[in-house]
Amino acid sequence: MDKFTTLTGIAAPMPLVNIDTDMIIPKQFLKTIHRSGLGKNLFDEMRYNPDGSEIPDFVLNQPAYRESQIIVAGDNFGCGSSREHAPWALLDFGIRCVISTSFADIFYNNCFKNGILPIVMPQEVVDVLMEDAKKGANARMTVDLENLTVTTSDGQSFPFELDPFRRHCLLNGLDDIGLTMEKAGAIDTYEAQMAQSRPWV
């Protein structure tokens, strides 16, 4: 998993509330077990017409936001059914951070396991960030995980809170496997001791 320290990039404004996981990645794309390749189907039914042509008004189809790395979203982002494909699709598109007033719990937890930083901020702050994101590609937002701040293109800085353990994992690029591998030495020692003391196990 890639480390997340400081991210400066284009932020896409998505003020719609209750964006659920089926909107993020529709059910017909859940057959794969591969994390790569889902980015093209991110927000599929919002991005494309039935004939496969792009819907010009959708934010990620607009030239200014095609390279977005941050989403500033409406309340309750990631609600709906549990599917890890949702953060997979976001990450494969290039999204590393989503900012909202609230997230569905399962989606929130899945983000951390896949290298995406979900940030919860008060409505008044999200409103400011949403307006900054509407400035387009020339307005770059900065998310500083080390200092726990989000800074707008005009220099306004807002603090956010995050569980220290989750912050540690993102800063060091540690998913569940990475955390286990940190203990590889201790695991090997334990197994060697068990082989000596309980060879029948």
UniProtKB/Swiss-Prot annotation:
Q: What class of enzyme is it?
A: lyase
What are its E.C. numbers?
4.2.1.33
What keywords were assigned to this record? Amino-acid biosynthesis, Branched-chain amino acid biosynthesis, Leucine biosynthesis, Lyase
This enzyme catalyses: (2R,3S)-3-isopropylmalate = (2S)-2-isopropylmalate
Q: Which InterPro entries match?
A: 3-IsopropMal_deHydase_ssu, Aconitase/3IPM_dehydase_swvl, AconitaseA/IPMdHydase_ssu_swvl, IPMI_Swivel, LeuD
Q: Which Gene3D superfamilies would you find in this protein's record?
A: Aconitase, domain 4 (3.20.19.10)
Pfam short name (any one): Aconitase_C
Q: GO biological process: what's one of them?
A: L-leucine biosynthetic process
Q: Which GO terms describe its molecular function?
A: 3-isopropylmalate dehydratase activity
- Could you give one GO CC term from the UniProt record? 3-isopropylmalate dehydratase complex
Task: State the pathway, as annotated in the record.
Answer: Amino-acid biosynthesis; L-leucine biosynthesis; L-leucine from 3-methyl-2-oxobutanoate: step 2/4
User: Which ranges form a coiled coil?
Assistant: none
Q: Which SUPFAM superfamilies match?
A: LeuD/IlvD-like
Family matches, as PANTHER family: 3-ISOPROPYLMALATE DEHYDRATASE SMALL SUBUNIT, 3-ISOPROPYLMALATE DEHYDRATASE SMALL SUBUNIT 2-RELATED-RELATED
Task performed by this protein: Catalyzes the isomerization between 2-isopropylmalate and 3-isopropylmalate, via the formation of 2-isopropylmaleate.
Provide the assembly information.
Heterodimer of LeuC and LeuD.
Similarity comment text for this entry: Belongs to the LeuD family. LeuD type 1 subfamily.
Q: Which NCBIfam families match?
A: leuD, PRK01641.1
> What HAMAP family does UniProt report for this protein, alphabetically?
LeuD_type1
What protein is this chain from? 3-isopropylmalate dehydratase small subunit
Q: Which organism is it from?
A: Paracoccus denitrificans (strain Pd 1222)
Its organism's taxonomic lineage begins at: Bacteria, Pseudomonadati, Pseudomonadota, Alphaproteobacteria, Rhodobacterales
Gene behind this chain?
A: leuD
